């Protein structure tokens, strides 16, 4: 389908890395466009107040524009910002964080931190690749999904995966095609550890002896004695995965030498995808937390102990809480593995359902580290009272909008000051923003009545903004309806004029004939 093309001047980037422009009162989100560029765009989704569009041509380039390294960029959904110069990516993400803090949380950090950034390429040590037999493509495809699509990108290489893993994409495509269950193996999970690599194949049917021989040969060919390539199968959910070859491989681990910590983990368990940046992130978080011997510190959403164990190395006593029982078990094992079992304790808890009473029951914490998923930790932070408030909170975030919301709760209702905040470029060439923020208790908590008044005011502001948007949309609809009515009236006038003229000419011709 051919879409109409128009010119726009791009003003900024949104949180997904799309160019933002305004044309005829509408907000445009334009894939592939950068701030200060003049582009020809083609709209592919239209709503009353906004449109989604694709860049067709760049008439005036931004100083931020770079040539994408990957030949699949623009089709593959694995990256969205390879067309942006690397240092500009970092600056854009920092601006996204600051804008969210100001707009959503109505807060400003006393200090903006220098961004944490590392290697631009080959950083991703965990990935979930899709696999599918596609007859039209002549075989099996292995890779990330295409942008905004369920189709798998036809990939031959990937510049964000480690080079030796990228080199496996084509051999994987060829090998899977030879399996008896090639059409029943929809996913390959990749895990790159300190001493080995693991491929977890999601097998929806049992493999045959011949399939096992093929997988074994693949491991032998592409692994090495000093760095094995271990094959795992996953017949159902993530907890069902198990190794099949080689069985004498070392454990899958990542390390943080600065804290003398080694973390064993399963390939399907959550860990940070960028181990270099993870180590720097942990170091920065602990610098702000400043754990001291004898302090009691909480690690909320602790996972397998990524922050818990480095904190415990300081001599502090750490209590980790996590909503997944398998991750809690792994965290306990990792504490023992590192000889820190006497310094840490863990429990499973739903941290999205914390109350003032349940938080108080945990006892007083001197400090707290929070590392929630994208939904944030608003319920946990609302449960803090004057009696239970930690003196310091370090918040590690994977979503700047929920961090901003939660920062608003801490600053405006719990008596905290946002001392510092900055971004962590955990995912180069994507719009994903990780960040860290340091809060210090400097004032009293608001009373419950005061909090209710603040929440009521915020709710009223949201409703007013919603009503304003609705009124704007209705006004736009009315304007368009008026335009259509005007066009229809003009068309009808032209039609009436045509027939009137025709009738006049017919009458003149009839008179002339007489």
From Swiss-Prot:
Q: Which reaction does it catalyse?
A: uridine(1939) in 23S rRNA + S-adenosyl-L-methionine = 5-methyluridine(1939) in 23S rRNA + S-adenosyl-L-homocysteine + H(+)
Binding positions (S-adenosyl-L-methionine) = 272, 301, 306, 322, 350, 371
Q: Which InterPro entries match?
A: 23S_rRNA_MeTrfase_RlmD (IPR001566), MeTrfase_TrmA_AS (IPR030390), MeTrfase_TrmA_CS (IPR030391), NA-bd_OB-fold (IPR012340), SAM-dependent_MTases_sf (IPR029063), U5_MeTrfase_fam (IPR010280)
- E.C. number(s) listed in UniProt: 2.1.1.190
**Any transmembrane segments, and where?**
none
What are the recorded GO MF terms, alphabetically?
A: 4 iron, 4 sulfur cluster binding; iron ion binding; RNA binding; rRNA (uridine-C5-)-methyltransferase activity
Query: Which keywords has UniProt assigned to this entry?
Result: 4Fe-4S, Iron, Iron-sulfur, Metal-binding, Methyltransferase, rRNA processing, S-adenosyl-L-methionine, Transferase
| CDD domains, A to Z | AdoMet_MTases
**Has the keyword DNA repair been applied to this entry?**
no
Keyword Repeat in the entry? The reply is no
Give the protein's function: Catalyzes the formation of 5-methyl-uridine at position 1939 (m5U1939) in 23S rRNA.
- Family classification: Belongs to the class I-like SAM-binding methyltransferase superfamily. RNA M5U methyltransferase family. RlmD subfamily.
Q: What is this protein called?
A: 23S rRNA (uracil(1939)-C(5))-methyltransferase RlmD
Q: Which organism is it from?
A: Chromobacterium violaceum (strain ATCC 12472 / DSM 30191 / JCM 1249 / CCUG 213 / NBRC 12614 / NCIMB 9131 / NCTC 9757 / MK)
């Amino acid at each position: 389908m051919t879409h109409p093309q128009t010119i726009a001047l791009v003003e900024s980037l949104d949180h997904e890395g799309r160019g933002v422009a305004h044309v005829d009162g509408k907000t445009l989100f334009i894939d592939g466009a950068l701030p200060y560029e003049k582009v020809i765009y083609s709209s592919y989704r239209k709503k009353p107040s906004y449109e989604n569009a694709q860049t067709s041509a760049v008439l005036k380039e931004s100083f931020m524009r770079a040539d994408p390294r990957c030949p699949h960029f623009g089709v593959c959904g694995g990256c969205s910002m390879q067309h942006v110069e690397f240092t500009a990516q970092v600056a854009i993400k920092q601006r996204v964080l600051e804008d969210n803090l100001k707009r959503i949380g109505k807060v400003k950090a006393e200090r903006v931190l220098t961004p944490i950034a590392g290697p631009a390429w080959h950083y991703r040590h965990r990935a979930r690749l899709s696999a599918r037999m596609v007859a039209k493509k002549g075989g099996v495809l292995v890779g990330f999904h295409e942008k905004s699509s369920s189709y798998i990108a036809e990939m031959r290489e990937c510049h964000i995966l480690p080079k030796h893993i990228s080199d496996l994409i084509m051999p994987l495509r060829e090998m899977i095609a030879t399996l008896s269950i090639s059409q029943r193996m929809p996913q390959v999970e990749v895990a790159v550890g300190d001493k080995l690599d693991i491929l977890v194949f999601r097998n929806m049917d049992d493999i045959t002896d011949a399939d096992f021989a093929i997988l074994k040969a693949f491991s032998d060919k592409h692994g090495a004695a000093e760095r094995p390539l271990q094959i795992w199968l996953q017949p159902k959910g993530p907890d069902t995965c198990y190794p099949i070859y080689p069985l004498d491989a070392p454990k899958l681990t990542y390390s943080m030498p600065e804290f003398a910590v080694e973390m064993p983990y399963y390939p399907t368990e959550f860990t940070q995808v960028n181990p270099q940046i993870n180590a720097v992130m942990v170091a920065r978080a602990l610098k702000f937390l400043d754990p001291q011997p004898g302090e009691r510190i909480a690690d909320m959403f602790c996972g397998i102990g990524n922050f818990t164990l480095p904190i415990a190395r300081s001599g502090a006593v750490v209590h980790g809480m996590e909503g997944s029982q398998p991750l809690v078990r792994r965290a306990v094992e990792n504490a023992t593995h590192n000889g820190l079992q006497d310094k840490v304790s863990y429990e499973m808890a739903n941290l999205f359902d914390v109350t003032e009473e349940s938080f108080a029951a945990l006892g007083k914490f001197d400090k707290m580290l929070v590392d929630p998923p994208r939904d944030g930790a608003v319920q946990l932070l609302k449960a803090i009272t004057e009696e239970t408030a930690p003196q310091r909170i370090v918040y590690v975030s994977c979503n700047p909008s929920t961090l901003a919301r939660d920062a608003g709760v801490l600053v405006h209702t719990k008596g905290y000051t946002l001392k510092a905040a900055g971004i962590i470029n955990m995912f180069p060439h994507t719009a994903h923003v990780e960040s860290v923020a340091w809060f210090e208790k400097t004032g009293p908590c608001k009373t419950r009545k005061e909090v209710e008044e603040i929440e009521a005011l915020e709710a009223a502001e949201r409703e007013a903004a919603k009503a304003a948007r609705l009124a704007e949309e209705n006004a736009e609809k009315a304007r368009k309806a008026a335009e259509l009515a005007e066009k229809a009236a003009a068309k009808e006038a032209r039609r009436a004029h045509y027939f009137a003229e025709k009738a006049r000419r017919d009458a003149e011709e009839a008179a002339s004939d007489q």
